């Protein structure tokens, strides 16, 4: 789901697909014209575009580009029907969260800037927290500006990542 700078983001997605990424499934890029109303609107829109047969879904924040595939696999390994799987890094909740299809209806109605946290708060009894290996200390860096990105790259280089 794109919003701000949608054309630039879509262009970069296209480049990545051509150069290095391979997907076994179809990838859809959806523009959220209401993106300024908060990330909840993007989560809601994305949920409405999920394949009907999907069992669960991640919402991976676009401003956290260092989330590792290993983290995704570890989260998926702990998924069970009717759960919300939240990764922990060093005991702290992190991204991305894996939502079972049971929560799609709630997710599709989100508004505001809390995003999936609204659904998490509503369904505490369905939460499964999982400590993930998190080999990359930068995987939950929140990059909101080009300066944040440059700083993260410098720090990663200094630490040998």
Model-found features: residue ranges?
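Short, flexible active-site loop motifs that bind/organize anionic cofactors or intermediates
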Residues: 62, 94, 106, 138-139
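A generic structural signal for short hydrophobic patches within well-formed alpha-helices
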Residues: 72, 103-107, 149
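Nucleotide and nucleotide-moiety/phosphate-recognizing core
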Residues: 1-62, 66-93, 125-134, 154
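A polyampholytic, Gly/Pro-enriched intrinsically disordered region
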Residues: 53, 107-110
């Amino acid at each position: 789901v794109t919003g701000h700078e949608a054309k630039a983001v879509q262009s970069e997605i296209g480049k990545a697909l051509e150069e290095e990424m391979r997907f076994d499934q179809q990838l859809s890029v959806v523009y959220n014209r209401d993106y300024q109303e908060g990330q909840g609107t993007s989560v809601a829109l994305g949920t409405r575009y999920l394949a009907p047969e999907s069992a669960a879904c991640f919402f991976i924040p676009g401003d956290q580009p260092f989330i590792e595939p290993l983290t995704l696999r570890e989260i998926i390994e702990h998924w069970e029907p009717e759960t919300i799987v939240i990764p922990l890094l060093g005991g702290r909740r992190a991204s991305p969260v894996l939502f079972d299809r049971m929560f799609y209806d709630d997710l599709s109605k989100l508004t505001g800037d809390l995003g999936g946290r609204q659904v998490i708060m509503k369904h505490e009894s369905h939460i499964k927290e999982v400590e993930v290996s998190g080999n990359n200390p930068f995987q939950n860096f929140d990059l909101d500006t080009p300066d944040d990105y440059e700083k993260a790259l410098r720090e990663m280089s200094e630490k040998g990542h």
